Each structure stands twice: as structure tokens, then as C-alpha cells.
Amino acid sequence: MTTPTEFLPPIAPLDEALRKRLQHVIDHKTKPPGSLGQLEALALQIGLIQRTEQPRVQRPAMILFAGDHGIAVEGVSPYPQSVTAQMVANFLAGGAAINAFSGVAQSELEIVDAGVASPLPASERLVSLPIGRGTRNFAVEPAMTRDDAMAALAAGAARVRHHAALGTNVIGFGEMGIANTSAAACLMSRLLDVPIDACVGRGTGLDDQGLAHKRAVLARALSRHSHAIAPLDVLATFGGFEIAMMTGAYLAAASERMTILVDGFISTSALLVAERLAPGVRDYCVFSHASHEAGHRRMLEHFGAKPLLALDLRLGEGTGAALALPLVRAAAAFLAEMASFESAGVDNRDA
């Protein structure tokens, strides 16, 4: 049986022999050791990923995957499914938060139709790769077939390889899809063996009654699909086409030795699947922020992650990843450009 990793090159482990040398270089920059805080750990990680003491950020890119979810018919979101297509049109017109933030971060932005249910406007900025016109309702049946999940993984990987061929070495992923917090919560619950109540948040703004309804719907769905245990089966049962494409994108980005900016709750749920398929992907991930959405901090704990930002974001779209990109630039720049005590002629003798 074909597995998702068969169409990907292996993910190379980071060079632990280089770690000590990079740490020495960082510690001997013209600053007290540790005084750049979390940026020092980030610079070390980027140096390890790029295998150099002179890292560079080249043609950074953000890919936003959009798709609809059949579970939306269960009333788990206060917004109608049509909002997904409306927001994609907004992305294409340049009017969303991710457009503004990727512009500030000087990042390429690509919008991918992974499976939006409603028609989308024609645009040169849209990459149309729909696996289907929305997933099925996983409260009743699996969201997609295993073959659909595999096709989505391959499509996401192909988009990353496209950007790698253009020189991209830093990449982030965003998403859009009404009810995709429900899919992400079920992925988290099953893959981390966490009660669904700890995974479910208000999403786009559910009130208390709506939150209770969402929890009940998802609890029943998890019970109905108790047989889905293997990561690809979990993805096919509960995931969305945009989440599956993002999973493939993570795997390809790690295999291409890219620095990967991880966004919020939904993006991290896709990483949970990717990690189960290829654990080495984690080494290439920079966690941009701690989302305000319930469950995200538990995911971050699972990955042993210390996010760069804590801004109470809960928008998605890749906004947190875009906001963190300037910090990646800064970390790479200080490692590559900052003088050492010796080269600058600065006295570093103990007081």
C-alpha cells in the first residue's frame, strides 16, 4: 500500500556536530551570552537547518490553503459555509489581514483552492487544485477517502517544491475554511488522546450554547469513528482538504531543508499529522505564536515549543506566521553579520 512518505525524499536529521560550533559562534558575538534571548535559539535552529554559520532568508513565501468542510451543516460555526469563498475572494483582492501582514513581512503570498464548495472568481493569483468541492460531513461518514487524502498530501508537497525551485528557503502556511476548527479539534483529540472538551474552542465566535453544541457533535463523531487510529486514517476521517494539503506541504518543506513557520491551531493540527508520518519534520519548524484558541497551548506543549509571539491571535490565515517572519530575518542576520569579540577588537576578558 502506498504511504504518504513514498513520494517524498527522506527528511534529513539536523547535524548535531554543527550545533556545538554554531553555539560557540553565537556565544562569541559582541554581546553578553544569552542577551538576545529567544533569538539566539532561533538563530541556532536556522543555522542548523541551512547548515551554515552564514544563514540567509531567501524569497520567503506564505501559502494559504482554502477548503470547505461538510461538518459545517451541523451548525458548529456561527458563519455559513459561503463565507469561505467570500474570504478567498477577499484574499485575491488583497483585502485581508494576511495580505497586509505578508506585505509588511516582504513575503510572497499564494492562495490555493484545495476544495472550496462555492465558485471562486477567476484570478491569476489563485492556484486551483480542488480535491473536491468540500469534504463530507464526518458526523455521518469519513470526511474524505484515503485516496483523496493522499492526493491532497501530494498536491501540497508539489506547491512547496514549486517554491523551492524558485529559491524559497523560509515558508509559512495559512488556511481558510468555515468549520475547520472542528476538524482540527478532532485531529488533536485522536492523535494526542486528549478529551474533546480540552480541544474545542469558540472558533469564529460561538456563544456558550453554540460551544456546548459543537462539543457534543464532535464527541459523537469521534465515537462513531473510533476505528480511525493510524495518522492517514485520522486525517481522512476528520480532516479537510486544506489541512491535508498543508500536511503534505510540511513534509515537503522539511525534505527541502526549509525553515517552516507554523501558524495557529489549525496549522498545528496539520503538523500533528505530519509529525506522525515523519517525526523529523519537527526540527524544521519555528512556532510563530500561541493562539488564543483552546487547545493550541496543549499542542505546543506536545511539541516542546516556545512560540515567538503571544498576541492572543485566533484569526488563522497564516497571520501569526507572517508576523513572525521579521524575527526570523533578524535571527539569521545577527548570526551572519554580527561581529565577534575577536573580529571587532572588543575586550571579552572576565571582569
Segments the model singles out, each with a brief description of its role:
Residues 2-351:
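N-terminal loops that bind phosphate or other acidic moieties
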